[in-house]
Every structure is written in C-alpha cells, then in structure tokens.
Amino acid sequence: MSNPISSISFADRVRVPDDVLISNLQDESVILNLDSERYFGLDNVGTRMLTVLNSSDSIEAAYQSLAEEYDVDRQVLRQDMLSLIENLLKQGLIQVSRNA
C-alpha cells in the first residue's frame, strides 16, 4: 500500500508497479502508467535515481549508493530524492511501502 507523501521515511522501499512502463530514450526516460495514462519524463540523473531506488531495499540504501556515485552535497541529494519520490508518487508511477 502507498504511504501518504508526508510520511515518507528513508527506511521505506520504492517500487515501480507492474502497470507502469519505463522507456529509455538516449539520455532520458519516459515513465507511463498504463491504467491512468499519466506519464513523466526524467533526465539522466532522475533516471539513475529511479533505477537505484527501484533496485534497493530502502530509500536510505539508494541514497548511500547514489552519494558514493555522484559528487554532490548530501543534503542536496536527499532533497532531490525526496522531490523525485513525491512527484512520482503523486502521479501514481511508483509505490512506497514500509519495510518490515
């Protein structure tokens, strides 16, 4: 079940649901929810963030991985990740769930 946006925790897990398709186009990607027909475009950094989030056990694990990969202020990365998660969640393009 999806969390309300205000209660997103870095211990939570992000997944792309089965009814959402991701199409990579050179340096960006387009994400489409087949049920709602909503879509969202991501640049190469957003695409990488989503890929790491979707394959990690938690938002925190994805954050740590991306912090090692990119030379960026950690607070900026944390804010950018939360912004991306909130936007994709509002569009119904990801699910956020509590880790057990």
Regions found by a protein language model. Name each.
Residues 38-100:
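Long, charge-rich, low-complexity alpha-helical segments
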Residues 1-47, 51, 97-100:
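Acidic, low-complexity/disordered tracts enriched in E/D and polar residues
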